[in-house]
């Protein structure tokens, strides 16, 4: 465990994670300073009076006087103020690094462009089914530092590329990169390989690396080695097996579960299940309890969630599809009896939308594109696309057109922040309108 006594600690960014960092240091007899570029950041009213705070901008004087800077994942390491501090030899970490220095129980670490919240939650459910005292959080749910507990037997952490950038002490019992597709390109000016490099940090010092056999970008730089186990649709140690019209999860040639026993549906969710099973096996969880968890787990909100099935029409909320890869996963192998009414739009974060084009062929697809990058998305197939300013306008446009066998799918391939507070608000608004219009 690290000793922070006598250190001048500065925390950048409040919110729940920032507050967890403040509490962490106060519990160790260190009073940090806090700054946030927002004038009234969330959690400001919960800061103890003894903690100095600076809001509305970064305070370079504080930063250059610090011994340790704990930076929110929301601030880029390339920010001039952080670059200057790094050049001056000041240590810059994030909350995950603080956590890794303290955690006494094994850690399962999960990252990827898509599916990581589902897999993280699922591994947590597998641990609970085995009677293990487990802490689940990180980039979802509770911040990692709030999970620290002497009685915890296993930690399962979802980690973003931003969090991994400032983490160097992670030694996971099992770590995975589920997939790598373009995301946050506004934060990675050198492109996909720079983004991938941040993700690859998760494998450093990992006991087992769980890689995606269908995605070479998830492999360690030196390629697969004896630490690696793989999952995939048709390839990998953990893969899908199709026989006589049925689909099975299979591990090294052995059929372990028929997917019809699972409440999750869709090929992308079956591969999520394989990844979770590989991680649970690597962490030493009993296979039987892991399989039991797979039969009871219903999935997470806003992730290919059926919010209404009425008059033979399914309305599906996939608002968590905030990038192209996630929407590709939703469309890959999608079965629709009638017409697919696909809602796309929002802030594309400088992504290339062209990989979606191959899923939009055929006579049974209609596109409804909205938000900041609606025009770019409509250009994928203009003859079947309509553009509106808002998602609500798009839904009111399509509602009179839906018929028996149709599907209305919100899988926007974009962030929501141009028109919504977050993807949850967007998904809730879709669900509300579906129930009104369906």
Swiss-Prot record:
Top enzyme class: ligase
Record has Cell division as a keyword: yes
Protein's name in the database: UDP-N-acetylmuramoylalanine--D-glutamate ligase
EC number: 6.3.2.9
Molecular-function GO term, any one: ATP binding
Role according to the record: Cell wall formation. Catalyzes the addition of glutamate to the nucleotide precursor UDP-N-acetylmuramoyl-L-alanine (UMA).
Single Gene Ontology BP annotation: regulation of cell shape
Principal cellular location given in the protein's record: cytoplasm
Organism: Shigella sonnei (strain Ss046)
Gene Ontology, cellular component aspect: cytoplasm
Subcellular location: Cytoplasm
Keywords assigned by UniProt, alphabetized: ATP-binding, Cell cycle, Cell division, Cell shape, Cell wall biogenesis/degradation, Cytoplasm, Ligase, Nucleotide-binding, Peptidoglycan synthesis
Gene expressing this chain: murD
Entry keyword ATP-binding: yes
Similarity-based family: Belongs to the MurCDEF family.
Alphabetized NCBIfam families for the sequence: murD
Chemical reaction(s) catalysed: UDP-N-acetyl-alpha-D-muramoyl-L-alanine + D-glutamate + ATP = UDP-N-acetyl-alpha-D-muramoyl-L-alanyl-D-glutamate + ADP + phosphate + H(+)
């Amino acid at each position: 465990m690290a000793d922070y006594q006598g250190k001048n600690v500065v925390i950048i960014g409040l919110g729940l994670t920032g507050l967890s960092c403040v509490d962490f240091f106060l519990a160790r007899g260190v009073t940090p300073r806090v700054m946030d570029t927002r004038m009234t950041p969330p959690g400001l009213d919960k800061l103890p009076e003894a903690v100095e705070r600076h809001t509305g901008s970064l305070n370079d004087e504080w930063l250059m006087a610090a011994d340790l800077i704990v930076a929110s994942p929301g601030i880029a390491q390339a920010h001039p103020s952080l670059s200057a501090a790094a050049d001056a030899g000041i240590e810059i970490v994030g909350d995950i690094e603080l956590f890794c220095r303290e955690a006494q129980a094994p850690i399962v670490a999960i990252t990827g462009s898509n599916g990581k919240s589902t897999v993280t939650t699922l591994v947590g459910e597998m641990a609970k089914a085995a009677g293990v005292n487990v802490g689940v959080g990180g980039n979802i749910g509770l911040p990692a530092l709030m999970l620290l507990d002497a009685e915890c037997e296993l930690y399962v952490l979802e980690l973003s590329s931003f969090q991994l950038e400032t983490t160097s002490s992670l030694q996971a019992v099992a770590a995975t990169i589920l997939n790598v597709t373009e995301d946050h390109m506004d934060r990675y000016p050198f492109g996909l390989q720079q983004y991938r490099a941040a993700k690859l940090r998760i494998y450093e010092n990992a006991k087992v690396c769980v890689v995606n056999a269908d995605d070479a970008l998830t492999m360690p730089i030196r390629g697969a080695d004896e630490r690696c186990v793989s999952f995939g649709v048709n390839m990998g140690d953990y893969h899908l097996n199709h026989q006589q019209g049925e689909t099975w999860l299979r591990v090294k040639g052995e059929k372990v579960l028929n997917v019809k026993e699972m409440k999750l549906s869709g090929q992308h969710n079956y591969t999520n299940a394989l990844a979770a099973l590989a991680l649970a096996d690597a962490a030493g969880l009993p296979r039987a309890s892991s399989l039991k968890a797979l039969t009871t787990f219903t999935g997470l909100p806003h992730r290919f969630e059926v919010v209404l099935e009425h008059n033979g029409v399914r309305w599906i909320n996939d608002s968590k599809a905030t990038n192209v890869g996630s929407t590709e996963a939703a469309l890959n192998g999608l079965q629709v009896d009638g017409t697919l009414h696909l809602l796309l739009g929002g802030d594309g974060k400088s992504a290339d939308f062209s990989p979606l084009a191959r899923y939009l062929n055929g006579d049974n697809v209609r596109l409804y594109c909205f938000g900041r990058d609606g025009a770019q998305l409509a250009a994928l197939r203009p003859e079947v696309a309509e553009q509106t300013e808002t998602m609500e306008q798009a839904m009111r446009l399509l509602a009179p057109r839906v018929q028996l066998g149709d599907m209305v799918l919100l899988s926007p391939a974009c962030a929501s922040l141009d028109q919504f507070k977050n993807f949850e608000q967007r998904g809730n608004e879709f669900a509300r309108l579906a129930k009104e219009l369906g």
